[in-house]
Amino acid sequence: MRIILLGAPGAGKGTQAQFIMAKFGIPQISTGDMLRAAIKAGTELGKQAKSVIDAGQLVSDDIILGLVKERIAQDDCAKGFLLDGFPRTIPQADGLKEVGVVVDYVIEFDVADSVIVERMAGRRAHLASGRTYHNVYNPPKVEGKDDVTGEDLVIREDDKEETVLARLGVYHNQTAPLIAYYGKEAEAGNTQYLKFDGTKAVAEVSAELEKALA
């Protein structure tokens, strides 16, 4: 079961990824984790990646694809894997195909931007402890104050509305072509494209996922 996950930041992708991994016993493959592991292990691709990063440049698709190919050849990927954060572009999607990676399912979690902004912008944090709250879904006992210490809660930079909107803009620009690409792949019978309503309750989305992947 080889899966690609698509979904905007705040669409609940991470939560459902954990569910799929636990339910079907497949690992999540994150390009960031792979890069760090290859650099630490000092592999040939790791050395190439390190020299590029040290020079302040972006790691090329060729290196990333090489790492993906190495990673999915490992024993824990025998039953499948979950690709998160890759591919991000059409050349990367083409590259996956060229190195012979067959994708069984492309799963999109669809949530309107306005809902994501509400989800993210309502978050409040107590930085010292890491405790987080939400004005609507998980409010503190006293507005703006941490339940335990009574100290002020803050809005993290990442959760500010303008930051969230900027990240969503980047996501849509990058992902709209991929959604069209995998839609065509599904029409051609090369993969299955599944779309879920990410505004539903977590347990409901998980149940729908389990049914679709069974």
From Swiss-Prot:
<feature type="binding site">
    <location>
        <position position="167"/>
    </location>
    <ligand>
        <name>AMP</name>
    </ligand>
</feature>
<feature type="binding site">
    <location>
        <position position="200"/>
    </location>
    <ligand>
        <name>ATP</name>
    </ligand>
</feature>
<dbReference type="InterPro" id="IPR007862">
    <property type="entry name" value="Adenylate_kinase_lid-dom"/>
</dbReference>
<feature type="binding site">
    <location>
        <begin position="85"/>
        <end position="88"/>
    </location>
    <ligand>
        <name>AMP</name>
    </ligand>
</feature>
<keyword id="KW-0545">Nucleotide biosynthesis</keyword>
<dbReference type="Pfam" id="PF00406">
    <property type="entry name" value="ADK"/>
</dbReference>
<comment type="pathway">
    <text>Purine metabolism; AMP biosynthesis via salvage pathway; AMP from ADP: step 1/1.</text>
</comment>
<feature type="binding site">
    <location>
        <begin position="10"/>
        <end position="15"/>
    </location>
    <ligand>
        <name>ATP</name>
    </ligand>
</feature>
<protein>
    <recommendedName>
        <fullName>Adenylate kinase</fullName>
        <ecNumber>2.7.4.3</ecNumber>
    </recommendedName>
</protein>
<dbReference type="Pfam" id="PF05191">
    <property type="entry name" value="ADK_lid"/>
</dbReference>
<dbReference type="GO" id="GO:0005524">
    <property type="term" value="F:ATP binding"/>
</dbReference>
<feature type="region of interest" description="LID">
    <location>
        <begin position="122"/>
        <end position="159"/>
    </location>
</feature>
<feature type="binding site">
    <location>
        <begin position="57"/>
        <end position="59"/>
    </location>
    <ligand>
        <name>AMP</name>
    </ligand>
</feature>
<keyword id="KW-0418">Kinase</keyword>
<keyword id="KW-0067">ATP-binding</keyword>
<feature type="binding site">
    <location>
        <begin position="132"/>
        <end position="133"/>
    </location>
    <ligand>
        <name>ATP</name>
    </ligand>
</feature>
<dbReference type="GO" id="GO:0044209">
    <property type="term" value="P:AMP salvage"/>
</dbReference>
<comment type="similarity">
    <text>Belongs to the adenylate kinase family.</text>
</comment>
<dbReference type="InterPro" id="IPR006259">
    <property type="entry name" value="Adenyl_kin_sub"/>
</dbReference>
<keyword id="KW-0808">Transferase</keyword>
<feature type="binding site">
    <location>
        <position position="31"/>
    </location>
    <ligand>
        <name>AMP</name>
    </ligand>
</feature>
<dbReference type="InterPro" id="IPR000850">
    <property type="entry name" value="Adenylat/UMP-CMP_kin"/>
</dbReference>
<feature type="region of interest" description="NMP">
    <location>
        <begin position="30"/>
        <end position="59"/>
    </location>
</feature>
<dbReference type="InterPro" id="IPR027417">
    <property type="entry name" value="P-loop_NTPase"/>
</dbReference>
<feature type="binding site">
    <location>
        <position position="92"/>
    </location>
    <ligand>
        <name>AMP</name>
    </ligand>
</feature>
<keyword id="KW-0963">Cytoplasm</keyword>
<dbReference type="GO" id="GO:0005737">
    <property type="term" value="C:cytoplasm"/>
</dbReference>
<feature type="binding site">
    <location>
        <position position="156"/>
    </location>
    <ligand>
        <name>AMP</name>
    </ligand>
</feature>
<dbReference type="GO" id="GO:0004017">
    <property type="term" value="F:adenylate kinase activity"/>
</dbReference>
<keyword id="KW-0547">Nucleotide-binding</keyword>
<dbReference type="InterPro" id="IPR033690">
    <property type="entry name" value="Adenylat_kinase_CS"/>
</dbReference>
<feature type="binding site">
    <location>
        <position position="36"/>
    </location>
    <ligand>
        <name>AMP</name>
    </ligand>
</feature>
<comment type="subunit">
    <text>Monomer.</text>
</comment>
<feature type="binding site">
    <location>
        <position position="123"/>
    </location>
    <ligand>
        <name>ATP</name>
    </ligand>
</feature>
<comment type="function">
    <text>Catalyzes the reversible transfer of the terminal phosphate group between ATP and AMP. Plays an important role in cellular energy homeostasis and in adenine nucleotide metabolism.</text>
</comment>
